[in-house]
A protein has these predicted regions:
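Short beta-strand-to-loop elements that line the ligand-binding cleft
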Residues: 75-82, 149-151, 167-175
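Extracytoplasmic small-molecule ligand-binding "clamshell" domains
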Residues: 22-101, 110, 246
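Periplasmic-binding protein-like
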Residues: 120-127, 194, 198-241, 258
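A structural signal for short loop-to-beta-strand junctions that line the ligand-binding cleft
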Residues: 27, 57-61, 109-120, 210-214, ...
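Ligand-binding clefts/hinges and TM-proximal coupling segments of bilobed small-molecule sensing domains
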Residues: 23-25, 155-172, 209-213, 240-258
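Short loop->beta-strand "edge-of-pocket" segments that line small-molecule binding or catalytic clefts
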Residues: 34-40, 58, 138-153
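Flexible hinge/capping segments at coil-to-helix
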Residues: 27, 116, 129-146
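A ligand-binding cleft/hinge motif common to bilobed small-molecule-binding domains
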Residues: 84-88, 102-110, 159-162, 179, ...
Length: 258
């Protein structure tokens, strides 16, 4: 009988220890180590940009990341990734959260979790201002001789390849200087997120114009892509809700988008 009780006690201890281990979350780990690892491409203004001279990130989602770190009571460790490598780096657990203009997709949802959306989006053209009336529809764009430029590995390339059958698709690796290709006439247009077309129009006044950014070709949303952890998602969602309600998000948004 004593042996039975001893065996049961050991079993109970093992179950209790296992349950405690299972209760530990990624959120707990982040707080314990004092850092939140944030993956960013650093090539997608106004969301994120890596200044090669200073090796520092800046952008809307950089400011949001810093605000999230402050709410968590931890420092931010930025991990540079790229659009072609984003999924691979996420699966390798190189970062806890991906920020910097991340579009919600089902392929990404399979691998992790998304926060509540931060922005409604959609693909729309940006072209030289003199030509913007030419490219209002997919049918206008998908014509022989039209050069559609895209950056590789993300939703822009995916959208272009799904919709363009007759026009030329030019893949251009540098997402920072890609708009200069349109400005100087080496490409005719790019179809990208409406928020980016507005920002690039502001950077290139009178040269590049966003085409119907208020009525994009498709529906999409931006959100933060999290490693699969319910506690972390709950925290990020609650932080986003409170930041919207107290005006913090709008203040950061205005600094970059208005």
């Amino acid at each position: 009988m004593i042996r039975i009780f001893a065996t049961l006690a050991v079993a109970f201890l093992l179950v209790s220890t296992s349950a405690q281990a299972q209760q530990a979350s990624r959120l707990d780990d982040i707080v314990k180590r004092g850092t939140l690892r944030v993956g960013m491409t650093g090539d997608y203004l106004p969301f994120s940009y890596l200044d090669k001279a200073t090796q520092k990130f800046r952008g809307f989602d950089v400011d949001m990341a810093e605000a999230l770190g402050k709410a968590l009571g931890v420092r931010i460790e930025y991990v540079q990734t790229s659009w072609p490598r984003l999924m691979q780096d996420f699966e390798a657990d190189d970062f806890d959260i991906a920020m910097g203009g991340i579009s919600v997709t089902l392929d990404r949802q399979k691998k992790g979790m998304f926060s509540t959306p931060i922005m409604r989006e959609g693909k729309t053209p940006i072209a030289r201002c003199a030509d913007k009336e030419k490219y209002k529809t997919i049918a206008d764009i998908d014509q022989p001789g039209i050069r559609v430029i895209v950056n590789p590995g993300g939703t822009n390339e995916r959208f272009a390849k799904a919709t363009i059958k007759n026009a030329e698709i030019k893949v251009y690796n540098d997402n920072v200087t890609i708009f200069d290709e349109i400005a100087k006439g080496d490409a005719d247009l790019m179809m990208t997120d409406a928020s980016e077309t507005r920002y690039q129009q502001k950077l290139h006044p009178g040269v590049l114009c966003a085409v119907h950014p208020d009525t994009p070709f498709d529906f999409a949303e931006k959100a933060y892509w999290l490693q699969r952890d319910a506690a972390l998602k709950d925290f990020v969602d609650q932080w986003l809700h409170m930041a919207r309600e107290d005006g913090s998000t709008q203040k950061i948004y205005a600094a970059w988008f208005e």
